[in-house]
Swiss-Prot record:
One of its GO terms (molecular function) is metal ion binding. One of its GO terms (biological process) is proteolysis. Metalloprotease which hydrolyzes the alpha and gamma chains of fibrinogen. No activity against fibrinogen beta chains. Active against the synthetic tissue plasminogen activator substrate H-D-Ile-Pro-Arg-PNA and the synthetic plasmin substrate H-D-Val-Leu-Lys-pNA. The keyword Transcription regulation does not apply. Optimum pH is 7.0. Active at pH 4.0 to pH 9.0. Stable from pH 5.5 to pH 7.0. Optimum temperature for activity is 30 degrees Celsius. Stable below 40 degrees Celsius. Above 45 degrees Celsius the activity is sharply reduced. This is Herinase. Keywords: Hydrolase, Metal-binding, Metalloprotease, Protease. Its EC number is 3.4.-.-. On the 2D-gel the determined MW is: 51 kDa. It comes from Hericium erinaceus (Lion's mane mushroom). Its cofactor is Ca(2+); Mg(2+); Mn(2+).
Length: 16
């Protein structure tokens, strides 16, 4: 899994 993809998911969760 590309780190960029995981970063996008994490960012979305943090933003809520």
């Amino acid at each position: 899994v590309p780190s960029s993809f995981r970063t996008t998911i994490t960012d979305a969760q943090l933003r809520g």
